[in-house]
């Protein structure tokens, strides 16, 4: 905002998301979670504030000039559009928002995004592909991979066409190089089960008034995972904690749904000490509300 859209966005210095690409993916993954909070906010000013925060977060992700961020945003938009009840209306809205956001970006942003189609002329992209080849060859010759920190001169000398050690810049090739095909299979299977569990929440809690928020959590967790799956294909963030936090939310949500916890919570949830609430508690045979 200070640079009027002409500066590249960077993360906090010295943090895990200091790099523009890492920050962009972290921002993108949080947008659906902000939407979840907005959907269940009770006050209009909170809803408006979260809407503004989502717009600014998307602009910040684009302003990072991360090509992976652009692809991740497109993936999330595709999931939202596919699940939309009115695809024509929502498609137009997404298109207008996308065009308006891109119009805010500087000329060097457009030039950088154009390199997606001309990756053969981009030194950064070719370096990543070389690292991917190294990871593939390493896993092919070592059943359980090379362990952590495989970006060494020795490994690139033996398994890469160009001896230029660098990170894999892909969650998939990162896991492949470090843990082999077995590790990659387990990693993908884990996230597939999380996706299925989130889908279960989306469908099973949809018609339960007390648990409808859980249906929204499942649906929007899938949107976040779609963004991470696409954006993470170009970043070494296989151990980034935010997606695992979503995993925990989905697992806990499924356990909460399975034991129908809202029934128990309705009995134990504290209520304001009012005359009406005391009367309701007495009629229902529940403990009276405690005074503040």
Regions picked out by a protein language model, each given a short descriptive name:
Residues 1-4, 59-64, 81-123, 133-140, ...:
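A membrane-periplasm/extracellular boundary helix in multi-pass inner-membrane enzymes
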Residues 91-96, 193, 223-285, 289-292:
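Transmembrane alpha-helices of multi-pass inner-membrane enzymes
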Residues 20, 64-68, 166-170, 234-243:
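Membrane-interface catalytic loops of GT-C/OST-like multi-pass glycosylation enzymes that act
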Residues 89, 179-225, 245, 250, ...:
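Hydrophobic transmembrane alpha-helices and their immediate junctions
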Residues 5, 39-43, 87, 113-117, ...:
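Membrane-interfacial segments
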